[in-house]
Every structure is written in C-alpha cells, then in structure tokens.
Amino acid sequence: MSKEKGKKQERGITLVEAVIVFMVSITVIGYAALSKQFPIAMGILMALILCCGYSMAALHISWDSLFDSITKAISAVLFGLLFCLFVGMVCASWIASGTIPFLFYWGLRLLNPDIFLLVAFVITSICSFLTGQPWALLPSIGLAFMGIGTALGVPAPFAAAAIVSGCFVGDVVSFTNEVPVIASIAAGSNDSVGTIKSTFKPFIPAMIIGVVGFFAISMTMTINTEGVTSADVLMEGLASGFNLNPLTLLPLATIFILVFLKFPILPGVFVASVVGIVEAVLLQGMNWNTVVNMTWSGYVSNTGTASVDALLTRGGIMDFAGTIIMLIFAFSFAGVIKRMGMLNIIMSAAISKVKSTGVLVALTTLTTLIGVSFTGSANVSSMINGSIYKDAYIERRIHPEVLARTMAMNGAWWNAMLPWSASGALCLAVLGVNNFEYTFFMIPFWAALIINIVFAFTGIFTRRLTQEEADALLQNESL
C-alpha cells in the first residue's frame, strides 16, 4: 500500500519536451550515421537509453510498461529478423551453387556501363511490380546487378540507387504487396486497389523521370577504367572457378515460382536456399558438410583470381548478425517513443496550423518520412500518420486515397534508405553500400515526392469528396 502511495502519477509528454527529445535523438543517431566514428547501432542504443531514462525519470512511465512496448515492437518485426537470417543462407548457397556467378558472368558479357543503370533499374522494377517481393529480389537479382556494376566500373552509389529504386517498386504499387493495403486501411479507405490506381498518377511520371535520369547519369558518370579492364579477367575467373550450367538458375526460378504460387515468402526463401545447397553438391562438386557450414559462416571464394574472390566472399547467417542487432535496437527505440507518445503530439500540433490541401499533403509527406525514420517501418508509420490525418483529410473533403498514396509511396522508398530500418539494413548488408551514399540518387523517389505535392497544390489528380461522402465517412469514424 505504501509503495502505491509513493509511486508518482504517470503524465503525458508536452510538446516542448517532445521536440527537445526528438532533436536530441535525431542528433545522436545522425552523428553515428554520418560521422562513422562508431556503428549506427550504438547511436540508436544511446538514443534508446536516453528515451528510456527520460520516460522513467520525467514522465514516470514504469520500466514494465516500456519493456512491454519494446517486446511488442520487436515481435512486430520478427519476420524481418528471421528473413535476414535466411537471406544470409541464400547469399552463401546461391554463390556456392553457381547461381550468382552465372548471373555475374552473363551480365558482364551482355551489359556495358552506358546502359547498365538503365537496365538494372528497368529489370528490377518489372520483377518487383510482378512479384511484390523486394526482399526476395534484393539478395538475388539485386546482388547480381551490384556485382556486375562493380566489375564494369560503375560507381557504387549510382548502381545501388538504380537497384534499390527498382527493387522497392513492389512496395509502392504492386497488387501483391501489403504496404499499399495497410496504408489504405490506416487512411480509412479500405480500398487498396483504388489507392494503387491513385498512386500510379504521380508514380508513372516519376518512373519516366527515373529512366531518363539514370540514362543521363550513365552518359556522364566517370567510369573506373581499372574495373572495365578487369571485366575480362573476372569472366575468366568465373568460368574457371564454377560450372556455369544454365541449371544453376534453378534456385532463382524456384523463388519466382513460389512467389507466383502465393507460397509464404519466409519458407519460400528457405526452400530456395536448400535448392542452392543441393546444386552446390551436384553441379559444383562441393562437400555437403562444407556447403552447410558456409550457410552459417559465409562463402569463401578461393578461385585464385583476386577480383572474383573479392566479389564472391560473402553471405552466411553470421554476416547478418550485426544487421539483426541493429534492428533489435532500432525497433526497441521505436517501441519506446511510441509509448512516450512523442510523434503523436508533434504531428498533432503541426496539423492544427495547416490551411491548404498542398500544405497538408506536404506535411503528411514530411511526417511520413519522420515516422519511418523513428519507427523503422513504412507500415507502422502509416498506422501512426493515418490515425492523426484521417479526419483532417475528410474534413477538407480530400479523398482518403490521397492520404494513403502519400504515406505508402513515400514510406516504402524512404524505408530502403535508412540503415536502421529493416529494408534499409537489408540493402546495406546485401549491397555493401552505405545507404546515405545513394539516397540523393534515388531519382524516382524524389520525383514522385515532388510530383505528388505539386498535384496537391494545383488540384491535379487530387480526388475530392462530395459533402455527403465526407459526412458519411466522418459519421463512420465516430461509430
């Protein structure tokens, strides 16, 4: 009884407090990400400790309550953590089986630096739109294109930008992806098909700009001449070190078939990894135990050709251990700030000042990027932003699909640019390029962001509600 009396009453965070904690957290994480003085994971951990300490000392939130929020946040991303483990297996087994070397070899033979960025962007975009599975494409076709680009002497940030832009098209407009669905539900639309159709309006011109932009970069970029010279040496090393039989594409075909059959992606990736292990034994003549060990510790290339060995020594579950630790810290941090109510109070204060449709969509874009940055998830960001903006859009007679497309389109691509988000961490681990090095060159993302805001200011392709429709939606929200 005395303990209950001595326990201080929990209070809500004020706007001033939220802004200060927000800025300090951003500074700590940003310093770690940009200065490279210590790992990003440590910056996130420091911000996590700061927010936990402030929550307990100033807001009187109990540790049990904070820990409950942390466990809920981590459980929500358990799929991503397990997927990273399986991607490590895929990378190692597909290199050992000859799948990745086969794609490297023929990519080097058929492509040249002048068309590489354009081809990488278009092919990954088409595959991602059809499958809706960016995470399956990245460690397969994405990894292959990255290796090809490196060998051709294409600067890594340009290659990564083209690959990531294309691979994550599925998160933006694929009918088989959950990001548009969740954004639609969060916006109060419940019509994901309508949201995707609406998204195509800014998305198509953005993709055209992306095609032109990547082609222009290809024509003007400085090629690493040593990389171009070593392409022939690389092909010789690949041909001598591996059996480049077309059957080595079976693991890749397996994952595509399973995706089209709607087979769950997590066990699907595991099955494709097992197919790679079997092929490594049958086609490459490797020992069974050796291949299985490689899926844990990573593939170590010993072809005798330094350029080949540098490209192919990678993968394995342990190669993703650091990524998984960073994700655990990041989503723990997301759970704590959600419990604090920090983002909600900042966004609610901002929305009260908005007068025009253009400013509202611009603000939604900004808070979507902030939401993804702090939660590490496009879906969680959509749920937070949707709950805050839903009524504001309806009251201004703006159709919920405009809110949904703004959250889904911006959140999906931005998610791939943050090294502490699940998608961004996967990009970093697979491609080996710091996310912030290619962020500026994500041409379709920036184009779509600007076009969507311009549409809102001009009223073009910004669907409106009748007063009756708005009243009906508001009435449903109040039930």
Mark where each language-model region is:
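Inter-helical loop and helix-membrane interface segments of multi-pass membrane transporters/permeases
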Residues: E4-Q9, V28-F38, T99-I115, A156-A159, ...
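Core transmembrane alpha-helical segments of multi-pass membrane transporters/permeases
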Residues: A41, L45, S65-P101, D114, ...
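Membrane-interfacial loop-to-helix junctions in multi-pass transporters
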Residues: S75-G80, Y105-V122, T150-A159, G241-L249, ...
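Hydrophobic alpha-helical transmembrane segments of multi-pass integral membrane proteins
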Residues: L82-V90, N112-A144, A330, L343-I388
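Re-entrant/interfacial helical elements at transmembrane boundaries that shape
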Residues: A136-G147, V164, N177-S189, I345, ...
